A protein has these predicted regions:
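Conserved "HGTGT" condensation-loop signature of ketosynthase/thiolase-family condensing enzymes
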Residues: 1-131
């Protein structure tokens, strides 16, 4: 919520969220609940994915690689899929962009990175437009 506020975006502007998404039930459920708490009903219209489904967990490099993926999504209006998404957890009921990339306008996006011990960050990306 703070990343959206500080970026000058509004919650309803967010088109895409790259989650930390490690495919661990406690982590994925907690992140899903956090997204729903911040965005309310808007959460159901946002494309969400886990880049880690394609790259694996890159540990210290994960946040940087995922941020590059988010920037490319904003530049190219395409959201990468969450691959190998076969058995949805009923508690994770958002649009996780399962198995197939989605082409849609991406004006604003967020990239979540969380670490052990409370090292947490969300980066906000806005599409560049000429003034």
């Amino acid at each position: 919520e703070l990343a959206v506020k500080k970026s000058g975006m509004r919650l309803e502007d967010v088109d895409y969220i790259n989650t930390h998404g490690t495919a661990t039930p406690p982590g994925d459920i907690a992140e899903t609940n956090a997204i729903k708490r911040v965005f309310g009903e808007l959460a159901y219209g946002i494309n969400i994915n886990s880049t880690k489904s394609m790259t694996g967990h890159l540990l210290g490099a994960a946040g940087s690689v995922e941020f590059v993926a988010v920037v490319l999504s904003v530049m190219n209006d395409i959201i990468p899929p969450t691959i190998n998404y076969e058995k949805p957890d009923p508690e994770c009921d958002l649009n996780y962009t399962p198995n197939t990339a989605v082409r849609r306008e991406v004006r604003f996006a967020l990239s979540n990175s969380f670490g052990f011990g409370g090292h947490n960050a969300t980066l906000a990306v806005r599409k560049f437009t000429e003034m």
